[in-house]
Amino acid sequence: MYHVVAATTNPAKIKAISLAFDDVYGPGQYRIEGINVDSGVPLQPIGSTETRTGARQRVSNARQMRPEADFWVGVEAGIEDNMTFAWMVIEHLQWRGESRSASLMLPDIILQGIRQGRELGDEMADLTGISNVKHKGGAIGIFTDGKLTRTSVYHQALLLALVPFNNEIYQRPAQ
């Protein structure tokens, strides 16, 4: 049984990780442990580079805390221009898989608050009255009326990040 360390305690992210590992390895073939680690970036990362750095740093910190694990998974959401998205980073042994999620265009009223230094989740809570949005369906769930959720979008990106561990072509040396 694989020991998967999720570098988060966010239930929406842990659910997405669980769904992806179910799809790739099968239910009951792993156990997920969520741990709280620092991303090394601001609470609301801006730009793809800062967001990806946050996901990588989460994995690095999780590896230091749980070196005996088989997989370490970092998920970091960010804002770039007028879009929200997330980076997924998964490490196993010496390999790494990465993927960027689909992006959602944000309305100007939300972006205004983000430019003033607020987090997307706080802006969404203020505008909708829904508390702790980022631990639920996220902005994606609200704006798509539940047709997509933070979990469903992250699930898809996590499946892509797992590809290098399950396709032998990725493990062949370059010639």
Swiss-Prot record:
Keyword Metal-binding: yes
Cofactor dependency: Mg(2+); Mn(2+)
Binding positions for Mg(2+) per the UniProt entry: 38, 68
Record-linked InterPro entries: ITPase-like_fam (IPR029001), Non_canon_purine_NTPase (IPR002786), NTPase/PRRC1 (IPR026533), YjjX_NTPase (IPR050299)
Pfam families the record matches: NTPase_I-T
Catalytic function, reaction form: XTP + H2O = XDP + phosphate + H(+); ITP + H2O = IDP + phosphate + H(+)
The organism's place on the tree of life at top rank: Bacteria
Cofactor binding description: Binds 1 divalent metal cation per subunit; can use either Mg(2+) or Mn(2+).
Enzyme's top EC category: hydrolase
GO biological process: nucleotide metabolic process; thiamine metabolic process
UniProt KW Manganese keyword: yes
GO molecular function terms listed in the Swiss-Prot or TrEMBL record: ITPase activity; metal ion binding; nucleotide binding; ribonucleoside triphosphate phosphatase activity
SUPFAM superfamilies tied to this protein: ITPase-like (SSF52972)
EC assignment: 3.6.1.73
NCBIfam families listed in its UniProt record: inosine/xanthosine triphosphatase (TIGR00258), PRK05074.1 (NF003459)
Family, similarity comment: Belongs to the YjjX NTPase family.
Role noted for this protein: Phosphatase that hydrolyzes non-canonical purine nucleotides such as XTP and ITP to their respective diphosphate derivatives. Probably excludes non-canonical purines from DNA/RNA precursor pool, thus preventing their incorporation into DNA/RNA and avoiding chromosomal lesions.
Binding partners and assembly: Homodimer.
Protein name, per record: Inosine/xanthosine triphosphatase
Lineage: Bacteria, Pseudomonadati, Pseudomonadota, Gammaproteobacteria, Enterobacterales
